[in-house]
Amino acid sequence: MEKSRRALIVRGGWDGHQPVETTSEFIPFLEQNGFELRIADGTAVYADTDYLATVDLIVQVNTMSSIEPEEFAGLQAAVLCGTGLAGWHGGIADSYRANAEYLHMIGGQFAHHAGKDPTQRTGEQSDNYLSYTVHISERGKSHPITRGIDDFDLETEQYWVLSDEYNDVLATTTQEVRPWDAWNRPVTSPAIWTRDWGSGRIFVSAPGHRVEVVQDPNVRTIIERGLLWAAR
């Protein structure tokens, strides 16, 4: 009998990103693909290096949180040795702002999401929901995560991501110029990317603000494929 692979879901941080609800969307998929699951509410599990060495995939949704040095050391060591790391939105790209080594490993950090016209804002999260297009890159057209998916539109937060050239960018999105914003030319950021780190694979989807976003057929397919791609 083939041995099951192990997946660890680490969720927590800001409740506005619905870490429990969004990760729960993918539990049946992981189980159907033969993963034995463990769920951790927070980062303490990362300090258990013996356990992490047995994990094939970490799914992290933990926004605007912090991580202790021994916890990050455990996470980093696991990825370097081949454990896959995957996540979406601020749960992976805005997790531990004070840890430069984490940002280096992930390859992207949320910096901004543009808002609606100030005269139309109501003080709700939807003030930051814009209609925009996710453009599949040339690399993305042939990558197993995004192959066969055309450019698609979303209405949700549009992440401006600070990143580097080491990422394999599978899709992008462009922040347009509007009269009330500070920038004066369009800015293109990665929306979907992967990154090899040691023997491990990292997958990041910037879209994924709330359940309704990960339920979008294109986003769901990309995340599901990304989880399988990242796993050892």
Name what the model sees in each region.
Residues 30-31, 38, 54, 122-198:
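Catalytic beta-strand/loop cores that center a nucleophilic Ser/Cys/Thr
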Residues 27, 76, 103, 146, ...:
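Non-transmembrane alpha-helical segments in soluble domains
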Residues 4, 8-9, 14-95:
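Helical hinge/lid and interdomain linker segments adjacent to catalytic or ligand-binding clefts
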